[in-house]
Each structure stands twice: as structure tokens, then as C-alpha cells.
A protein has these predicted regions:
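Periplasmic-binding protein-like
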Residues: 20-26, 125-147
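Alpha-to-beta junction loops
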Residues: 7, 30, 50-53, 67-74
């Protein structure tokens, strides 16, 4: 599918996900954003050559909005629940240094626990090829094992 002049696009309306959605649109050259803004909003769009129209919705509603808009930017967990597959997407977020804020991680309550042997075993048990395969299967490619990336 190609994005056309004047198409309506639904975006998540919470600050983190809206910024991430706009960055995805910018990565795909549909809009240009003001430089240096970590969590952009639609007010930070500096160029919109296709005159795209934006509808901000609760993130949980973006997949359902596909019946009413040309394009929706949908978070991976919501996409998986709606049976949307990354292979059918017109764009998928690229893993870059900008992705770091959205990486899930295993954390200890205190930095003094950083070297706790039990916690290290949990991390080792989680960061396996089998877990990576399960992530791919369950999330149909929309969630990736972050331990394979250097940020």
C-alpha cells in the first residue's frame, strides 16, 4: 500500500507512543520533524508534503481504527492482539539508537544487586536462542530480543 495525498493516519495519543509513531513516519520520509526533539508531537512536524491528516487515539484503539483511516501506527502488543502481522505492514520500526527508550529490560531493585548470582542466572536463562524463537513466534516478528543489539 502506498500512502497518498491527504490520507488520514491514526496515531497513539500518549506522549511516548505518539513520539515514537511520528519518528516512524519520519524514518519513512512521510513527514519531517523538528530536530532534537526526543518525544515529538504533531506540533513538531516541520514538513508534511502529502498533507496527511492525523487522528490521535488511545493506543488500544489504533488497530480498530484501520476501518476508518488509510494508515494506523499500531504498537506491537496491540498489533499482535489484533492479529496484524509485521510482514503485512507498510512500514516497520527500524532498530536504531533512537529505539533505546522502548527496550524492555530485566532490572534489580538496587544497583547493589547488579551482581547478584541468582539475578545473573535469571538473565542468562532468559537471554537464550529459545527465548528469541518464542518472542518471534508469539509476537510474529514485532518484538525482537534486544540483547542482540548494541545501543
Amino acid at each position: 500500500k502506498e500512502v497518498k495525498q491527504g490520507d488520514q493516519i491514526s496515531l497513539p495519543n500518549d506522549p511516548s507512543n505518539e513520539g515514537r509513531a511520528l519518528q516512524l513516519l519520519a524514518q519513512n520520509k512521510l513527514i519531517t520533524l523538528k530536530k532534537g526533539v526526543a518525544s515529538p508531537t504533531i506540533r513538531d512536524i516541520t514538513s508534511n508534503k502529502l498533507n496527511l491528516k492525523f487522528t490521535e487515539l488511545d493506543a488500544a484503539q489504533t488497530a480498530r481504527s484501520l476501518n476508518d483511516v488509510a494508515v494506523a501506527v499500531v504498537n506491537n502488543d496491540i498489533a499482535a492482539a489484533a492479529n496484524l502481522k509485521p510482514a503485512n505492514a507498510i512500514a516497520v520500526e527500524k532498530i536504531t539508537s533512537q529505539s533505546k527508550p522502548w527496550v524492555n529490560f530485566i532490572a534489580a531493585k538496587s544497583s547493589k544487586d547488579k551482581n547478584n548470582a541468582t539475578y545473573k542466572k535469571i538473565v542468562k536463562a532468559y537471554q537464550t536462542k529459545r527465548t528469541a524463537e518464542l518472542l518471534k513466534k508469539v509476537y510474529k516478528g514485532s518484538t525482537l530480543p534486544a540483547w542482540n543489539y548494541k545501543f
